[in-house]
Amino acid sequence: MGQKVNPVGIRLGIVKDHNSVWYADKKNYSDHLLTDIKVREFLMKKLEKASVSKVIIERPPQNAKITIHTARPGIVIGKKGEDVDRLRQEVGELMKVPVHINIEEIRKPDLDAKLVASGVAGQLERRVMFRRAMKRAVQNAMRQGAKGIKIQVGGRLGGAEIARTEWYREGRVPLHTLRADIDYATHEAHTTYGVIGVKVWIFKGEILGGIEQVRAEKKAAKKKSSK
């Protein structure tokens, strides 16, 4: 049977950029990688209620720059920026270098695969019927302008004895088209019956200019936000 490759991994360098942006020699590479994993795990746990989608880690010489993409920046920043200062200290201790933290707001959380997946998982944990949770998420994404979306849940659905997989799709989700901008994420729902896996694919359109276009758009967005 044909197997599905990770849609983000296969598009790296084509229409997707890496979440860790640094270069290291053989001696330091594994340490940097392990630190990145620890930092991401720490931030995801600490900012559980802040709807964090992804954490981008850059390592200029002698310091580190972390960009947190979140749908609720107020929770990350805290009162008068107290929380983000504390966060900077804690992450600095983990990375053993001075850390600069940027917060980027996700304006359309219904078009972010990670947030959609965690939203569906949260509903499953609150015992919402899985079909209703999937349908609601799909409708919200299509309303926000997605070209296509597919949601898949797998496990003991509705407390069934035998685990199974169900999915729901609307619009186009062209996994073989490498220029297609497909956001993919997974999440786990921990229910009384066991773990239910949630997978989300969101197709946002085609990027004809390749990775250069993606980077140029990111740069323009950064300039706009810094003004």
Swiss-Prot record:
Part of the 30S ribosomal subunit. Forms a tight complex with proteins S10 and S14. Belongs to the universal ribosomal protein uS3 family. One of its GO terms (biological process) is translation. One of its GO terms (molecular function) is mRNA binding. Pfam families: KH_2, Ribosomal_S3_C. Residues 39-107 form the KH type-2 domain. GO terms for cellular component: cytosolic small ribosomal subunit. Keywords: Ribonucleoprotein, Ribosomal protein, RNA-binding, rRNA-binding. It comes from Hahella chejuensis (strain KCTC 2396). HAMAP family: Ribosomal_uS3_B. NCBIfam families: rpsC_bact (TIGR01009). CDD domains: KH-II_30S_S3. Binds the lower part of the 30S subunit head. Binds mRNA in the 70S ribosome, positioning it for translation. It comes from the Bacteria. This is Small ribosomal subunit protein uS3.
